[in-house]
Amino acid sequence: MTIFQSEKQIVMNFYRRLDAAPTDQIGTILQSTVSDDYIWRGFHPFNEIRGGEAVATCFWSPLKAALTSMQRRMDIFFAGMNRLEGDDSVWVVSMGHLTGLFDQAWLGIQPTGKMVMLPYCEFNRVADNKIIETAMYFDIPHLMMQAGLQPFPTQTGAHMIQPGPMNHDGLLFAPQQAEEGDRTMASINAMITDLGQWDSGLPLEDELRRTWHENMCWWGPAGIGATCSIERYAKQHSGPFRAAFSDRSQTQHQCRLAEGHYGGFFGWPNFTATLSGHFMGMPATGLSGEFRVIDIYRREADKLAENWIFIDMLHFWKMQGLDLLKQNEETPHT
């Protein structure tokens, strides 16, 4: 059985140092932890950054300065080998919230002086005792809504702070049985095969039941929201989403892995599609857009029971001609 304890320890040691560091030491910590050719990918407006010092300057130092007493509250932590064909790289996954007192403006979002929780999920590729590559996805519109802004007209699901797994067993610090990870990966792959191209020929709810638990929970991003049960997921997200888009490209992932009952993937982007109908209260544009997505899953028996989703909505809507961060900065606030 292949275990990934050393890679997990490298990431956990990095988190401990990063989370405790003052802003003027973050660059030094990253430089000692990441490789010389380190690549970091994050949601708009950060996009792709190269080098530990640049990541510290552009992302971590401003964020930690904005969130006084910032804490990392992890709900899920696991590791594994990339299951995509021809790739045996090892990745460590962390998901939860970065929480603190919103005391300084960030990305033009004005501070509230109150506690906020920024949902995040991070994939770290580890090799030769260094972090080589990171995909760090975080829900900026969710933070905007916590600060009293309304970046989107409406959403089909419920707006809430995403909880961790129902079983509270998502922190896989100890080694897991390889067979359980294989079962989780098989469930995820079956779902991708069924849903990836929207062409199974089955009624939507019947299609979903092939791979999803009847009482599944879907923790969607701000602008779409959360829902539960196959019937309500079909009504409040999957159905409206499919109806809004056409010309969906094939799915492309950078990494796909599983350990124990947990697994997930990310892409850059995962797929493209044309906005040919109404979506998130916005009209059709006829323009193609990229979907940069992280999906994390919890398996129960052989069905997917929970799904946490991070979508770069700011990037997608910017491709549709709507720069939500710029719009916020140009709007007078009282």
Regions found by a protein language model. Give the residues of each.
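C-terminal and inter-domain tail/linker signature
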Residues: 1-334
